[in-house]
Structures are given as C-alpha cells and as structure tokens.
Amino acid sequence: MGLRALLRLALGFPAPPRRPPLVQCALAGTGPRRLIAYLTPGSQGWILDFLWRDLTATSVWGDGEAPELLVASDRNSLASMMEGADAFVLVMFQGHLPRLLRDGIPAERVILYMSHVRIGLGLPDLSRLHGVLALNAHEEALLRMQGVESERLHRFPAGYDPRLFFPGRPLAQRRFDVLFVGRYVGSSNSNYHQRKRYPLLCDLIGLLSHQGLRVAVLGNGWQACEYPLPAALELIDAPHSDYGAVYRQTRLVCSVSAQEGGPVSFLEGLVSGCLMLSVATGFAADFQSGVDGIWHLPLKAEAPLWCEQIQACLLAAQADPDLGSGVCSPARQAFLEAAQFERLALQLRQLCDQSLIGGSMERSDG
C-alpha cells in the first residue's frame, strides 16, 4: 500500500479502490491480432464513431493477415479483448487516456487519436505510447514540442470518402452562396457551444441573408436554436451520405469555429470545389490565406467583417476562372489525397503491423 493510502487510513478515510492489474498482452505473433477502438457510449452518433466506421469499411482490412477489428465501450470490455492477444487499442478521445493507463492498459499498446488540444486536460507521457495520430500540422508541431518522437508521431488528416465527395459544376451554376455545416448544440454544453461560437454564426447568417445571399445550414438540431434566424435560411437535415450533393450545390463553405482539429467539413468542401473561409485553425491553417480559394479571418473578427469577406470571396471567384471552375487545383488535390479513408486506413494498418517501439511488459507463454 502506498504512502498516500496509508495516510488516508490514518486520518480515518476509506482506502482508495485497488487499481486493476496490468493487462497482459501476448507477444507479437503468439496471440490473436486485434485492433480495438475505445469508444464510450457518449461517442455514439458523433464524429469519432463515424470515423471508425469509415476507416474499418475500407478494403485495407480484407486479407487474412489483418487484425480483427473490435469496439470496446468500457475499461473491462477493453481489458478482456486485449488479455492474451497481440492487440492495440485506438483511443479516440485523449480525455480517456490517463484513466485507461492507470487502470492497467499497457501504454505501449495504445495508439492515441489526438483531435485537438483541450485546455485543462492533462495528458501522461505520450512518448510511452505506440503511436500518436495528429490531425494537422499545428497539432503535430505542439506534440513535437511536448517531446513525442518522430517514429511515434503520424499525420492523420481524417478523412473523407472520394466516392461521396468530388468536384461539381462551376460555382456560378450552384444553388447556395454560403453553406455552414454542423449540428446545433445548445448552451447547456458550454464548452462545445463556446468553441463553435453559435451567437456569432447566427448574427452572420442574418447579415448574409439581409444582403440577399442564399444561405443554408447543413446539420441537425437547428430547430432548437436559441438565437434568431432569418426566414430565408434553408435548414438541411440529411444523412451524411447525401452531404456531397449539398456541397456540390454550394459556392462557399464558412466556419466561424474558434478551434478545430479538422473539421471534416473542410475536407468535404475542399474536394467539392467550394471556396473556403474560416479562422486559421485545424486543416485551414495548413494553407496560406488568400491562395487557392482559401481564406482566413482573425479570431476577433465580428460578424460584419465576416460578411464583407464572404462577399469579397464570391466576387474573387467570379473574376478568376480557375477559382470559379468548381474543380480542385493541384495544391488542393495533393492535400486531399492523404486524407482519403483508404489511405488513412492503410496508414493505421501499417502502424498495427509495426513492432513495438521500445520495451514492453507483455507476457511470454513459454
């Protein structure tokens, strides 16, 4: 028993619960191969759930040497799947990582999907993990500064399906001038609500509509919006398989979100030939503002400046045949090739096929 536990007992407090023992995985090649996604019930219906589904639906996992693909929703189910297996766990939310490591999940068997930095969320030593997946260049740079070695760090710009998302007709022939993408989440979820900046977004929608622009929002939950929206706004609640058709009817995709790891809508709009405007966060920060149909605004910009910039972007596309063509430029295409689900799944498969980096604490049945 540790000193802290003894002190608690001396002061009359109950002893802390015992930590579970370290999960004992098999040595490489001596047990069933498994890749397990750790997705708690709170992830269901959100982007991490969809990401795992799309990655595992690719042909990369179809051969007899591929690991078995499983999902665990709690620590106990995860431990039972890993025990005695040559297994890796893909932790899809960094907030789960410290508890899993404390509860006996071997660090060298963890691949962490790092979506974006979250203030106040402490992380253990990531250099102990088998791999860390970073969505964009900014997150990758932060992880390098934190000391994550290059052999463990991988760019993972997840992701889109090119069968659903591809270039459309010229911008002048498209139905919507401006599209905003994402579900509405009420102010009771303060962190998400603040990050997505719904008050600013709704103010901007009102200004754009007042200017006569055709504006749409793609996503669910907007009927419960707490802020006024113009009657002319078109609300589109469609399955994700239909999103590509909406992008191909759109001239410009806008996001006012204060922080993103992606978002996926940036990839989907980019490959659909849309103009893109956002804060310099996530994937957008990998591009120079004002080049190749991609623009950034400062975080402090208010709704009138966003409205003015959107109108300037639309005018620029009218004057530039390349921007207005609705076809991906070579620079966009190079970025997008690495973000296709098939490419990402192959990258994840190769990571699972790698030998463990450094020492391990696995058992040998010999």
Name these PLM-found stretches.
Residues A258:
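Aromatic "clamp/platform" in nucleotide-sugar-dependent glycosyltransferases that forms part
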Residues G221-S241:
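Nucleotide-activated donor-binding/catalytic signature segment of Leloir-type glycosyltransferases, i.e.
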Residues L121-L123, G159-R175:
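Acidic anion/phosphate-binding donor-loop and adjacent secondary structure
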Residues M1-M92:
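N-terminal pre-catalytic "stem/leader" segment of glycosyltransferase-like enzymes
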Residues L275-S278:
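Short hydrophobic beta-strand element within catalytic cores of glycosyltransferases
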Residues A301, L305, P321-D353:
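A charged, aromatic-enriched C-terminal amphipathic alpha-helix characteristic of glycosyltransferases
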Residues D177-E226:
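Conserved catalytic-core segment of nucleotide-activated headgroup transferases in glycan assembly
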Residues T56-L142, G147:
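Extended catalytic core of nucleotide-activated donor transferases of GT-like folds
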